[in-house]
From Swiss-Prot:
High-level lineage: Bacteria, Bacillati, Bacillota, Bacilli, Lactobacillales
UniProt enzyme class: transferase
Protein name: tRNA N6-adenosine threonylcarbamoyltransferase
UniProt cofactor(s): Fe(2+)
Protein keywords: Acyltransferase, Cytoplasm, Iron, Metal-binding, Transferase, tRNA processing
Family as reported in the entry's similarity comment: Belongs to the KAE1 / TsaD family.
Taxonomic source organism: Streptococcus pyogenes serotype M6 (strain ATCC BAA-946 / MGAS10394)
A GO CC annotation given for this chain: cytoplasm
Function recorded in the entry: Required for the formation of a threonylcarbamoyl group on adenosine at position 37 (t(6)A37) in tRNAs that read codons beginning with adenine. Is involved in the transfer of the threonylcarbamoyl moiety of threonylcarbamoyl-AMP (TC-AMP) to the N6 group of A37, together with TsaE and TsaB. TsaD likely plays a direct catalytic role in this reaction.
Residues given in the record as substrate binding sites: L136, V137, S138, G139, G140, D169, G182, D186, N275
């Protein structure tokens, strides 16, 4: 059997990445050019800055990914690219590069949903068992997804306001922590105690929706009031209390989803899946079903996860033509207008 190689491109936010996947789940390379240092002084991602950085480094990422994988363009079977959701300018840079490369090398183009990529990152460490439920937690999304079979995604719950990663970054900014703040808050939380009371929005309600805006506002109000009154707050305890509230919400909704849908596996993915507190709680509280979390290097945005998701679409011969466009608000159940089934 001839080996299959997929080159994948990811540029939906502030990471420029190109990866090479061999067959179903072997990543030969996963080159990531991070922009974190450029955005730190702004306390968040500036779309125009992100787009310009993508343009500067994407060609080098292509070259490095192929060199690291030890193959040439003539060995490739397909090109995959994130076409949404994400920042429109950032998406267009990766999309233009992927389309040009695919056209020049006469390769089929596979459109990949960024969040499907996060979910399918778990495929690298072991085969996924269906049906499964996925908890996707990142800076832009918080979703519960039911996946009855490969490539078939159904959102069963999502945030009504802030994404969980967004809440981490916003409270981190209030505390004067470095962007992105999630890792530092997690580390501080492990040194503190849950002593401050924060709301757990909708935690007892019957639906599977999330809300983090009230928690974020309560945290900011507590911090500002204490500062105005000259009261000292213990940073470690603040982080521990905030994180305890976040994890209570995530675990409660995930358990409800598992009780309502026939699932053989739980996948937890996205940037916030790197959170050690979340990993610890999952290990302690969800023991009746296998929990799969991608390795730390695949939790953040990267093209490796896009390639792993693309392998599913390749098997189904789901390709797009060169009119494929960026979809910044792409939903899980939305297919590209240029979708072609061969």
């Amino acid at each position: 059997m001839t080996d299959r190689y997929i080159l994948a491109v990811e540029s939906s936010c502030d990471e420029t990445s190109v990866a090479i996947l061999k067959n179903e789940s072997t990543l030969l390379s996963n080159v990531i050019a991070s922009q974190v240092e450029s955005h730190k002084r702004f306390g968040g991602v500036v779309p125009e800055v992100a787009s310009r950085h993508h343009v500067e480094v994407i060609t080098t990422c292509f070259e490095d990914a192929l060199q690291e994988a030890g193959i040439s363009a003539s060995d490739l079977s397909a090109v995959a690219v994130t076409y949404g959701p994400g920042l429109v300018g950032a998406l267009l840079v990766g999309l233009a590069a992927a389309k040009a490369f695919a056209w020049a090398n006469h390769l089929p183009l596979i459109p990949v949903n960024h969040m499907a990529g996060h979910l399918m990152a778990a495929r690298e460490q072991e085969p996924l068992v269906y049906p499964l439920i996925a908890l996707l937690v990142s800076g832009g999304h918080t979703e519960l997804v039911y996946v009855p079979e490969p490539g078939d995604y159904h959102i069963i719950g999502e945030t009504r306001d802030d994404a969980v990663g967004e809440a981490y970054d916003k409270v981190g900014r209030v505390m004067g922590l470095t962007y992105p703040a999630g890792r530092e808050i997690d580390q501080l939380a492990h040194k503190g105690q849950d002593t401050y009371h924060f709301p757990r929005a909708m935690i007892t309600e019957d639906h599977l929706e999330f809300s983090f805006s009230g928690l974020k506002s309560a945290f900011i109000n507590l911090h500002h009031n204490a500062k105005q009154k000259g009261n000292e707050l213990i940073l470690e305890d603040l982080c521990a209390s905030f994180q305890a509230a976040v994890l209570d919400i995530l675990l409660a909704k995930t358990k409800k989803a598992l009780s309502r849908y026939p699932a053989k596996m739980l996948v937890v993915a996205g940037g916030v899946a790197a959170n050690q507190g979340l990993r610890d709680r999952l290990a302690q509280e969800i023991t009746h079903i296998e929990v799969v979390i991608p390795k730390l290097r695949l939790c953040g945005d990267n093209a490796g996860m896009i390639a792993l998701a693309a392998a599913i679409e390749y098997d189904k011969q789901h390709f797009a033509n060169m009119s494929l466009n960026a979809k910044p608000s792409l939903a899980f159940d939305q297919f590209p207008d240029s979708f072609v089934i061969n």
